[in-house]
């Protein structure tokens, strides 16, 4: 069986050159990117990684990839990350893994952003996947109520144990469901006006290259 995620994830490593500062995304596809980068580092590649989550940080450390915090780098040469959805206008939803705030901060500091996806992540309109909102625990119910007044349905994200999911930053996540984001710019502006929302999962002006792996194993490169 063809592993689309592995194909897309490993393909992105072709953009990595010696001496680069590399943003390391979070998720099941970029997992394979990081595994491949670990092999390349062990074979003599010199890079510095900037992790977008504790999960990625641990994986990179175990593979021997040198790491720095975002505070300790001036800029990032290239960031490789996954996506939950992306449309033909290069607008995406991220944050299914809960790392949206750090992912967006790293993406913003990057000269180039590559997203690695399998073909079902390419959509005509955003919204099949829930849109995550990272909210502070203090008063999160107020955020939920404000959205309800706008007829926006949300679910508080929970772990499989039933406990509330807590991000690496100590925050909660509200997932907007049953919504289509045809005017993503409007949504971005709307959400920015609600106190308590730390960040949202709309990534509108970040990605430069999409590496899409198809079911037959072929790779499609989509560039701006």
Swiss-Prot record:
It catalyses: aldehydo-D-ribose 5-phosphate = D-ribulose 5-phosphate. InterPro entries: NagB/RpiA_transferase-like, Ribose-5P_isomerase, Ribose5P_isomerase_typA_subgr, Ribose5P_isomerase_type_A. GO terms for molecular function: ribose-5-phosphate isomerase activity. GO terms for biological process: pentose-phosphate shunt, non-oxidative branch. Keywords: Isomerase. Substrate binds at residues 26-29, 81-84, 94-97, 121. The active site is at residue 103. Pathway: Carbohydrate degradation; pentose phosphate pathway; D-ribose 5-phosphate from D-ribulose 5-phosphate (non-oxidative stage): step 1/1. Gene3D superfamilies: 3.30.70.260, 3.40.50.1360. Transmembrane segments: none annotated. Its EC number is 5.3.1.6. It comes from the Bacteria. Catalyzes the reversible conversion of ribose-5-phosphate to ribulose 5-phosphate. Belongs to the ribose 5-phosphate isomerase family. HAMAP family: Rib_5P_isom_A. Homodimer. This is Ribose-5-phosphate isomerase A. It comes from Listeria monocytogenes serovar 1/2a (strain ATCC BAA-679 / EGD-e). The lineage of its organism: Bacteria, Bacillati, Bacillota, Bacilli, Bacillales. The gene is rpiA.
